[in-house]
């Protein structure tokens, strides 16, 4: 999407991939790089660029994030400073009224979570001159800024209490936090976000991320089809902010 040789936005870019610890594929657990080490590697590589590469931008696209997993729905919320419990939040629809996004069949539930050390590492990369694109997520949640009325909303479940409208690490206010534009327009002159895209004041930009055709593995678990130009390769139609983020990364 970002750097494809035929349709990519940055066709002359060089691609480097990292396998991160905890994000490995099936059968290769324990083979990824620790996240802090991966970020240090990127920063060190960026700072050491010389010659013809010295003036080339470093753009990092990240499509992963932290969540807290819990099997139960909240017993209490604090929504914009007001306590909610009991019959206030005893249905999924009522929870969503207070911007806690739980949907039928989604147990175990996953709520976005921030990790301060990871966010600090992101800021260090940005301070070094690296451009960061982060896919905002597909969890329906509102992601608010520190000054917003939803930033301090909390939920309480059996494993503890957490914030639910602060988004997911890796995050920085100085990064590009990318939401997903739907493939169906709102009107003849306006686009609209996809319904499950994370949204809100902390989402900086939206890019096309629905019904995106891109390359995939010939042994992938998606519903791939033969690449139209060469049947030895595969392509797939897929949706999510993971498809939107690379659009921005490629433009940068």
Regions found by a protein language model. Give the residues of each.
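Extracellular S/T/G-rich loop segment that most often corresponds to the catalytic His/Ser-adjacent loop
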Residues: 155-252
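Short acidic, glycine-rich surface-loop motifs adjacent to enzyme active sites
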Residues: 43-113, 135
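Subtilisin-like serine protease catalytic core
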Residues: 1-37, 50-59, 68-73, 127, ...
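Alpha-helix termini
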Residues: 7, 41-55, 113, 120-124, ...
